[in-house]
Amino acid sequence: MNAPPQKRVYPKLPVWIVEDHHEVVQHIYRAIGSRHIPMKGIKMVHLDSHPDLLIPVNMPADTVYDKETLLRELSIENWIMPMVYAGHVSHVAWLHPYWAQQIREGQHCMCVGKDSSTTTIRVTSKDDYFLSDALYVPLDHLEHPKELHLHVIRVDPVVSSQTTKLENGQSGAKIPKAAQTQDDMQSKADTPCTSSSQPPDGSAASGNISETAKKKADDGSTSYITDKLLAVIEQTDPFILDIDLDFFSCKNPFKDMFSQEEFTLLKELYSFSKPQQDPDEEELLECVERRTRQLEDLEAAFADLLEDDGQETVERLAANPGMKSLFRLVHSLKNRPSPPDYEMVHQAGLTCDNSELPHHISSDEEIQQMITAVQLFLETLPKPTIVTISRSSLDEYCPAEQVDSIQIRVLDILESLFGCLDVHRDYESIPAESTSHTA
């Protein structure tokens, strides 16, 4: 019997820093090709204010087998799932700051495969995050399904006084009351925050309500995060540590482009009508079909406006079902000094289904508290095989005036935990030589 191939080890921990998040994929593929991480069953710890788990809607599933074409097709919100369908990634722990909650807390098991009717990549999860983009299909509609185990884990800030408590073995940080808006508290009241195993054909949460209530108190603490991660990452596992710097401070860049009134109108146009609680397959498919038509109609409407946004065209489009708000929106946009960018308007609308993108510009103190939180749970994990970092500053998801400071602090904690780093600043106009990081 042939012995399994020897696992290769980097002399120093490689850290690839890119600007746009999907640019990390080429570096992950290179690590697969060099056999530093396995071809399949890859585990990823993903720190981000956004899940990045959407799917290129119209991309043929077989594109994943053509690396160069795939890299051209990917975008910042959809770079992980193609790697799942390709069979590379099987476990993702999405660690999100307390201000960002696009997917229910807990464990979700789903399948990612090729939709037999459209030949595109689709998913069996029934979570609103996927339903609102019309990405759900039943398991029996998928060819070559691959299982994805997704763990959604909240991270709360840790203040210096709590660091002392943690060193004495006490529980970690809780979300400060001042940071809990009424919407946040209602969301937590409505959302089960327990980690529960779920079947591959969906991701509906279940569990005893009283047990859920007891567990809520510890969500976000260092001990809670550590327990969840160590259930996924074993000491000998090669894994990817992926960090978007907007995890520490995050903007919704569309807030600078549109007024609150325009956002309200976009929400009316793009509002997602959820299925009833515990929907059957027929209701789910009707929901997906309805949402697909809605998004296609909106895309077509804004494409028409690119050609002609005169009064007659706007009135004709606004007369269609669900399009009433279009008239006021276009009127508001045309009152600006510069002509509307209707393609950008549509992109903004796609973020306004039932919730806006996360927006929390952190103070320097808040950034440090999140840095401390990350350091505390990372020190309990084995050393990652590779680290990928996205700056997300040119598209303004991470504030440009904060990104360099955050990057320095993140590199500092990585070096303090894992020793000398092999840092590649891939975002610079002239790529820097691979260098060891010094504080």
Swiss-Prot record:
It comes from the Eukaryota. Residues 179-211 have a biased composition (Polar residues). Pfam families: UPF0489. InterPro entries: UPF0489 (IPR024131). Residues 163-219 are annotated as: Disordered. Belongs to the UPF0489 family. This is UPF0489 protein C5orf22 homolog.
